[in-house]
Amino acid sequence: VLDTGKNVPSQRIESLFSLSQFIELVVPIGSERKFVSAIIVPNFDACIAYFDAKGIPYDKSAVVYDNNLGPAPVCVKVGKDFVENEEFKKLIDKEVQTVNKELESYEQIKKYFVVDYKFTEATGEMTPTLKVKRRVVMEKFKEEIDALYK
């Protein structure tokens, strides 16, 4: 519930982002706030394929893969240069705007930030059943979240 009294069900926002090719996970934030913001975890494998197809350079030495998350290695971390790349920012922003078109104005994500690693059980943000540990995420990214509301 926003501080305006409007109720914004995070499941609705999360389910709309589940259709995105380039965004793996979104953690909507809005409780007792003026507007909805979000933490975005990209689908790094899809984003890397996009970068490679477009010939967009990035620091390949900063990319980390995990062989334990499925049948094929999964990208779990990229370098800061990757998430700060202008093409990448446009790509993610386009995905956010696509979802925002499906939402009421008070439900729309007004500000967000993108993390450079995949949330997993090993990094502490996910449960064994792959549910987001919201309290952990809110504590871990407190400064970044507060900055969105300044």
Predicted regions and their residues:
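AMP-binding adenylation
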Residues: 1-150
